[in-house]
Every structure is written in C-alpha cells, then in structure tokens.
Amino acid sequence: MTNHIHFRCPCCHGSQYRTSSFDVSDMNPFGAKCIFCKSMMITFDNISQYLNASRLSLDLKK
C-alpha cells in the first residue's frame, strides 16, 4: 500500500488538485479534480489506458 498517489490532469497536464466526496464516481474513485480546469484527474497507473483510448500525445509537460 502506498501513502502517496500521483495525479495528472489529462487536459492541462497540471498536477495540483483538490478532492471532494461529492466528486467521487466510478470514473473518479478518489474524487480528485484539477484546480485549474476542473477536469477529472487520472493516476499514472492508468494513464496509458486513458491515452490509448483518447489518442492523446504522451507529452506530460509542466
């Protein structure tokens, strides 16, 4: 079990987020949303799955 989960925004590639119990869903089990564009955050363990599904580039620049 890890104590730290790294999130990344698929839209703006930001890594700052907020969590809320109101945002928890099947697609967003942690309830994490980007503080900049309000998109659902994804974790790095499922980022390849997300990128293949939406055909985004793998550039994760800050």
From Swiss-Prot:
UniProt cross-references to InterPro entries, sorted A to Z: YmcF-like (IPR056946)
Stated induction or repression of this protein's expression: By cold shock, 10 degrees Celsius (at protein level).
Pfam families hit by this protein: YmcF-like
Family, as annotated: Belongs to the YmcF/YnqF peptide family.
Other noteworthy facts: Probably uses the non-canonical initiation codon AUU, which may limit its expression. Part of the Qin prophage.
UniProt name for this protein: Protein YnfQ
